[in-house]
Amino acid sequence: MAPKLLLLLCLFSGLHARSRKVEEDEYEDSSSNQKWVLAPKSQDTDVTLILNKLLREYDKKLRPDIGIKPTVIDVDIYVNSIGPVSSINMEYQIDIFFAQTWTDSRLRFNSTMKILTLNSNMVGLIWIPDTIFRNSKTAEAHWITTPNQLLRIWNDGKILYTLRLTINAECQLQLHNFPMDEHSCPLIFSSYGYPKEEMIYRWRKNSVEAADQKSWRLYQFDFMGLRNTTEIVTTSAGDYVVMTIYFELSRRMGYFTIQTYIPCILTVVLSWVSFWIKKDATPARTALGITTVLTMTTLSTIARKSLPRVSYVTAMDLFVTVCFLFVFAALMEYATLNYYSSCRKPTTTKKTTSLLHPDSSRWIPERISLQAPSNYSLLDMRPPPTAMITLNNSVYWQEFEDTCVYECLDGKDCQSFFCCYEECKSGSWRKGRIHIDILELDSYSRVFFPTSFLLFNLVYWVGYLYL
């Protein structure tokens, strides 16, 4: 029994040792194959020798083909994001991948490898274009977690150099139609020191592309598209090839509609409420008028905070100013009405009383003594004295006339198409004139103000949105 157990133990131990040896052999083979695929030692040596040979007599201070022909730079730009756009500072922010391709015959090499992909450590060892962004205020390259730069060298000497940049570029906004304005914000770049005789920039086919706009921070703008141009700019240092990308932006009106337009319209409508308040309610109408004027002043100040201090009138300035004039005119309407209402003619009761109970000492200078029966009274049948005047079959006593009556009869106020009293309406001097009753000014205003404001809005919105 014991020899059998010993034999079984020896058999199991032998099988275990053999299987372990097979696993180790397979692991060594796989690891050696993986190492050979990723970075063969012979290829590492080959690349190192190629780079050392290329840079041995290379002068990075000299551009390719110097003294022979201009260096041609092919440009590609991938727009990662745009925004935000600042109307106050007249600038916008853009995040791009900027790629430049050129040929340097000094970097040709013979090898089984057609492309050498290198990191940013190689950038400072070869010549690269001195490209600048002409309208940039600030610009920075990305360095996290490593410098965002790529360098590729083909065996025929072609070089691709890309880097990621965030640029705050200047954009001169024309705000005449603000907030219904559209803009073309440029990104301008060129060589800093090489004129067109030494360096030429070219756009490649489909050279400008844009990423998904969902991550863009445009906020108040819609991206309408882009276009690129090439031009020659003449300076005192020479003629330079200048490349420009225009980003077409259209402003969204939602924010300004809620913030400015709707409050202004409601304030103007609120000022019309005074036309339906009794004209003798002076405190109520005055308080309403002053409140709406102060509200419009506040709204105009707030509207200007989102704009730079431009010297011309914008579309929003025009709208706010007209709304302010409507509100101010509503207040002045009541001031006019209140002034002429205070010059009101004496009431009918007072006139009737004056006629029925006149002061005999004023209009009957003396009594006539005649003999008459006791059941009869004697009356003076002479014409009325000069102190009494007649106008439109109505009798007025001159001593009861106030200043307004005198001015109206004199034609001083009536020549301006306004009447103090209804009797001014039919005088001989009124022939061919339009009668406007100043006491009915509220009735006229209830129609005139809404109609004129509606016409203004019609012209304003059609003119700025469709013309």
UniProtKB/Swiss-Prot annotation:
Q: Which gene encodes it?
A: GABRG3
- Those parts of the protein on the Extracellular side are 18-256, 304-311
Q: What is the organism field in this record?
A: Homo sapiens
Signal peptide span per the entry? 1-17
- Record-annotated disulphide pairs: C171-C185
How is this protein named in the record? Gamma-aminobutyric acid receptor subunit gamma-3
This protein's membrane topology, according to the annotation, is: Multi-pass membrane protein
SUPFAM superfamilies this protein is in?
Answer: Neurotransmitter-gated ion-channel transmembrane pore, Nicotinic receptor ligand binding domain-like
Q: Family, per the entry?
A: Belongs to the ligand-gated ion channel (TC 1.A.9) family. Gamma-aminobutyric acid receptor (TC 1.A.9.5) subfamily. GABRG3 sub-subfamily.
Q: What is its main location?
A: membrane
- Which stretches are transmembrane? 257-277, 284-303, 312-332, 447-467
Q: Which CDD domains match?
A: LGIC_ECD_GABAAR_G, LGIC_TM_GABAAR_gamma
Function description: Gamma subunit of the heteropentameric ligand-gated chloride channel gated by gamma-aminobutyric acid (GABA), a major inhibitory neurotransmitter in the brain. GABA-gated chloride channels, also named GABA(A) receptors (GABAAR), consist of five subunits arranged around a central pore and contain GABA active binding site(s) located at the alpha and beta subunit interface(s). When activated by GABA, GABAARs selectively allow the flow of chloride across the cell membrane down their electrochemical gradient.
Q: What is known of its domains?
A: GABAARs subunits share a common topological structure: a peptide sequence made up of a long extracellular N-terminal, four transmembrane domains, intracellular or cytoplasmic domain located between the third and the fourth transmembrane domains.
In this record, what's one Pfam family? Neur_chan_LBD
**What InterPro entries does the record tag this protein with?**
GABAA/Glycine_rcpt, GABBAg3_rcpt, GABRG-1/4, Neur_chan_lig-bd, Neur_chan_lig-bd_sf, Neur_channel, Neuro-gated_channel_TM_sf, Neuro_actylchol_rec
List the GO terms this entry assigns under cellular component, sorted alphabetically: chloride channel complex; dendrite membrane; GABA-A receptor complex; GABA-ergic synapse; microtubule cytoskeleton; nucleolus; plasma membrane; postsynapse
| A molecular function (GO) term | GABA-A receptor activity
**Catalytic activity line of the entry:** chloride(in) = chloride(out)
Q: Which domain of life is it from?
A: Eukaryota
The keyword Membrane is annotated on this UniProt entry: yes
Where in or outside the cell it occurs: the entry states: Postsynaptic cell membrane; Cell membrane
According to its UniProt entry, one GO biological process term is: response to xenobiotic stimulus
The entry describes its oligomerization and partners as:
Heteropentamer, formed by a combination of alpha (GABRA1-6), beta (GABRB1-3), gamma (GABRG1-3), delta (GABRD), epsilon (GABRE), rho (GABRR1-3), pi (GABRP) and theta (GABRQ) chains, each subunit exhibiting distinct physiological and pharmacological properties.
Per the UniProt annotation, where are the glycans attached?
N110, N228
Alphabetized UniProt keyword annotations: Cell membrane, Chloride, Chloride channel, Disulfide bond, Glycoprotein, Ion channel, Ion transport, Lipoprotein, Membrane, Palmitate, Postsynaptic cell membrane, Signal, Synapse, Transmembrane, Transmembrane helix, Transport
